Amino acid sequence: RDFCLSRGLGDVYKRQDMGLVYLDTGAMYRIVTLKALNEGILGNDGLNELDKIKKLLDDLNIDIRENGFYLDDADVSEEIRKPIVSENVSDVAAIREVREKMVDLQRKFSESKNVILDGRDIGTVVFPNADLKIFLVADARERAKRRYRELIEKGENVEIEEIYENILKRDKIDSTRKESPLKKAKDAVEVDTTSKSIEEVKNEILRMINSNI
């Protein structure tokens, strides 16, 4: 169950009824990033106090509910998608202690459930023995357009070039980091969504899931 890249899989999941529980693992790293921003642990130059990040993890209160993500009992589902979080999440996600904590939570969440996990290291680190691994890819420009439309619909004031540059930066950081780098699992099926509609991608994924049930 290895899924990757900006937007697409969440939309695919919302348009199906397979009886599977969906978890966007990237949102969990965004929650840690949001909390670090709120507590002033992240500055203009990025991460600056590793010890405080570790303390933050000890006190972290994440609640994954059917209607969204909660931090300290507050719904942060929209807030974690803001550009300031996107700009900093890859730096936070590269920290070993953060990844270890999130992977542990992801595995606990998946106990006794049939799940779809959406993330950048699911098939290589979190669940290397998953029943099905799908590696979604798309051209960076297309991903920037998708994210731009999504943020504009939410009333955000954003520039598409900034989104594009942020995507390139995140991809570089995520694919070269020491801890759980972004890469395709050897047994993953790659699906290029660049020129495909959500409906087309959904149907393709459904066919693969049904053939593995």
What are these language model-derived features?
Residues 71-77, 86, 148-154, 173-213:
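NTP-dependent small-molecule kinase module
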Residues 1-13:
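Single conserved hydrophobic/aromatic residue that forms the stacking wall/gate
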Residues 17-82:
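N-terminal phosphate/diphosphate-binding loop that engages ATP/GTP or pyrophosphate donors
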Residues 26, 73, 102, 116, ...:
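Residue-level signal for inorganic ion chemistry
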Residues 22, 133-135, 188-191:
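Conserved beta-strand scaffold positions in the cores of enzyme catalytic domains, especially
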